[in-house]
Amino acid sequence: MEPIKITKGDFLKNAGIVGMYNMLHVLKAREGEDFWTDEEEQVLCISREFALNADWTDMYFKAFVEIYGPMCTYQEIINRIEKCKGVIEKGDGKEKKSSIKDDLKYITDKMSSSSYKSGFANIRDKIENPEIYENIKSRKINVKMESDEILKRLSELENFLKQPLCRETFCMKSIIYNYINCFWNGKSFLHKANATEDMREMFEKDFSKPLKDYLLKSHEKSMGYCIECNALIDDGSRSNEKVPISFMNDMADDLDKKSSAFWNCKVDAYICPLCAYLYALVPLGFRLVGNKFVFQNIDCSLNALINSNETGKVVLEENARHSEEKYATWVARTLNTVFKLKIRELNNIPVILRGTNEKDGYTFNILHKDILNILKDKKIMEYLEKLSKDPNVKIKNDFLNVYESSIENLINYNNQYRLINRLIKASIETESILSRAVLVFKMQVRTFIIMRGKGENTEMNVKSMANSGYKLRKAILAAKGVEPDADECMRGTIYRLTNALSVGNTERFMDMIIRLYTSSRLDVPNGFIDMLQDREKFNQYGYAFILGLKGSHYVSKEENENG
C-alpha cells in the first residue's frame, strides 16, 4: 500500500512533524518499517498499514505522559510521598514529623484540586481501591496523626497513584492545562463543555476517528482542499473532514462565527484530519526550556529538523538536568547536534518561542549565519565544552553561570569584555575563577578573528601582550622577594587596571603601566602604543596583559610545547 507522506510546511506543521516523530520514537514504533524519511530527507513517510491499525488516541496519551510526565504535579506528589515515608521510617520525633508538614499539605491539596476530582470521576469504576482517593478528601493526612497511620495512608496512596490509569489520568490533567493549552484550545478535551468528560473519548471523537476515516476513504471526487498540505477533502456541510484551524492559538478567529474575511462570506480555510492531528502534536515538537517553549525551524532537511528538536530523548533521559536550562544554553547544545550532521550550507535559523502562560504569544528570533559560523568553530566549541563542565562561580553572595553568560553574549552580538572584567576582579579573591576568565577571553579573541578575518597577527600580538604581563609579574615579585604564586601585593594594581579598562580610560591605564615598567626597569612593549589608537586593541591587549600579570599565561605550557 502507498505510504502516507507528510511534507514540511510552516513552523507549526514542522513542529507537528517533530511531535509525530517523537511520539513514534518514544513508543518504539519500528523506524524503517512503520515510519521513515525519504532519501532526500524532505518527507516523513508512515506505513499505511501501520496507520490504519494504530490506536492514535492511545499513542497520543502515552507519548505525552512519557515526555511531560516527569515534569507534572503527579510526579511531585510521588516524590513528596517517598520523602515523607523516608522521614517517618527513620524515627518518630516531633521535629522530624514537623519537617514534612508542608509536604503533606501539598499532597492533600493537589489531590483535592478540581482537575484531579474531575479526572477521578471519569476513572472511578475502572480502577482498584477508589476509596483511597475518597478518604483523602474526607480525612486529610496531617502531622497530628500517629506515625504508623501516616505511613499506612501514604503507602496506600502511592500504590493507588501508581496504577497505570491513575498515572495517565492525573498526568494528563496537568499536561492539558499547563502545556497543551499553550498551543491549542477550544476543541476536544479542551472545549469548556467537555471539561468533565472522558479525555480519551473526546480526543478519539475529534481527532483519531476523523483521521482513521479520512485515511480509509477515497477522495477522487472530493472538491475541497486542505489549506496546509493541499490534500483533497470533502467540503460538504456535514463533512467531518473539514477542520477549522481556529483551535490553534493565535492562528485564526472562529471561522464558523466570523466569515466576513472570506470571498462572498464563504469560509474555505480548513485543514484535513491528518494536519489537524499534526497540529495537536505541536506541544511534543516544542521543547520546554526554563519558562519558555522553543522550536528551531531548521527546514533544510527532516533529519536536521528532528535532531535539533528531539524532545523525547532529552526529556526522558535528562529531564532533571535540563529542567532549569536557559535559552542560550539550549541553543548551544542543540546546535552542537545540528553541526554533527555536517550540513553543507547552514543558513539563518528561525527560533520560535512561546511562554508557558496560556495568553502568551509566539515570538520569533533569528540565529544568523555569522553567529552559527562562530558557534560551530572548533576552538569555540572546545572553549564552551570546557566551560560547561564547571560553569558556576560564586561572586560574593551570587552565583554566575559563566557558560550561559558567554553563550548569551555570542547570540546577542555582545562582546565578552564585561564578563571577563567581572571574572578577573572576582579572581583576585578566588584564584580558581581565573581559568574561566582565560577561557572567555580566548573565546572573545577567536570570535573577533572569525568575524574580521584577522587571524595570525591578532593571535600572535595577544599572546605577546600576555607574555609581557607575565614577565612583568615575575620581575615585580622577584624585586619584592615574594614567591611566584603569592601575589597579594599586586591585587590593588590589577583591580585598578581592570577598572580603567572597563571604562575605556586609556590615560589612566597607561599612567599605571608606565609607573609599573619604570619601577621594574623593563622596556614597555610596543603593543601599548598600538592599542592607544584602536578601542578593540585596547581591550584585547589590555585584558591579555592583565591576565598575564595576574599569573595566567594566555598560552599554556602545553600549547607552547606543541608549537
Model regions: which residues?
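Intrinsically disordered, low-complexity regulatory regions
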Residues: G312-G563
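Intrinsic-disorder/low-complexity loop/linker signature
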Residues: E41-Q42, K94, N230, N291, ...
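Generic detector of bulky aromatic hydrophobic side chains
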Residues: I127-E128, D206-F207, Y279, S432, ...
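Basic, glycine-/proline-tolerant helical and adjacent loop/strand elements
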Residues: E158-E324
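Conserved small-residue
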Residues: M1-D198, F364-K376, D530-E561
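Sequence-level detector for tyrosine residue identity
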Residues: Y21, Y60, Y68, Y74, ...
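Poly-acidic low-complexity segments
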Residues: N142, G224, G504-N505
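Extended non-catalytic scaffold regions that mediate assembly and binding
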Residues: E40, L211-D213, S222, C229, ...
